[in-house]
Regions:
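Active-site-adjacent mobile loop/cap segments within catalytic or ligand-binding domains
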Residues: 1-64
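A short, amphipathic beta-strand motif
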Residues: 68-76, 164
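Short, acidic Ser/Thr/Gly-rich low-complexity loop/linker segments typical of extracellular
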Residues: 97, 106-125
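Hydrophobic beta-strand segments
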Residues: 100-106, 138
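A short, solvent-exposed beta-strand micro-motif common in secreted/extracellular proteins
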Residues: 124, 134-144
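Hydrophobic core positions of the immunoglobulin-like beta-sandwich fold
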Residues: 127-129, 164
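Structured interaction patches on ligand/partner-binding surfaces of diverse proteins
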Residues: 143-171
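Compositionally biased low-complexity segments at domain edges in trafficked proteins
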Residues: 166-186
Length: 186
């Protein structure tokens, strides 16, 4: 991007650099759900990973990453965020409450290869880095949610995104509290 604001050509924050530089506008910290995701170091690592790939592409590097990445976020399938901090401004699955403290496993041929526990920072983010290419089973467990499994294909030099809606485990038996019509004797 080049702009002429009367003080020289170029973006102001990059104008006086003496080395190559990049400006990150990959996320919006004033969008509250994104703010919570940015608290997760692995989520921030992903932006650096994409920067690295873009530099490699720009300079037509012959090498690529031999491994892949599996990442995403876990959220409740029914519970909607209601905290006043959100001002009812959220989109897509960001409307749903993230799942904190879930254990996410990546299995290959039934053996656990990688394990990740989602943090308590209300973002539901999980990530597996440097995953060898191949077919895996993504397994999610949490005491308050039904177990979840899904097959994923990991390819070299790519990110496999899996945002997952989890169903809360019902802990109380259903109870009839009212019915109609009411039966009357006589």
């Amino acid at each position: 991007d080049f702009y002429d604001w009367g003080v020289g050509v170029g973006l102001g924050v990059l104008r006086k650099l003496t080395v190559p530089g990049m400006l990150s506008e990959g996320s919006y910290h004033d969008y509250i759900p994104e703010t919570y995701r940015l608290l997760n170091k692995d989520y921030c690592w992903l932006e650096a990973y994409h920067f690295t790939k873009s530099v490699m592409e720009y300079f037509k590097a012959s090498e690529t990453f031999a491994t892949g990445v599996v990442c995403g976020s876990l959220y409740d399938s029914r519970l909607i965020r209601t905290e006043p901090i959100y001002n009812n401004i959220f989109y897509g699955h960001d409307k749903m409450k993230p799942v904190c403290g879930a254990t996410v496993e990546l299995l290959q041929a039934g053996a656990v290869k990688y394990t990740y526990t989602t943090d308590q920072l209300f973002n539901g983010v999980y990530m597996f880095k440097d995953v060898e290419p191949g077919k895996y089973t993504l397994k999610v467990s949490h005491p308050e949610y039904d177990a979840f499994e899904q097959e994923v294909d990991v390819t070299a030099n790519n990110v496999t995104y899996q945002n997952l809606a989890l169903d809360r485990t019902r802990s109380t038996a259903p109870e009839v509290v009212k019915y109609s019509p009411v039966w009357k004797e006589g």
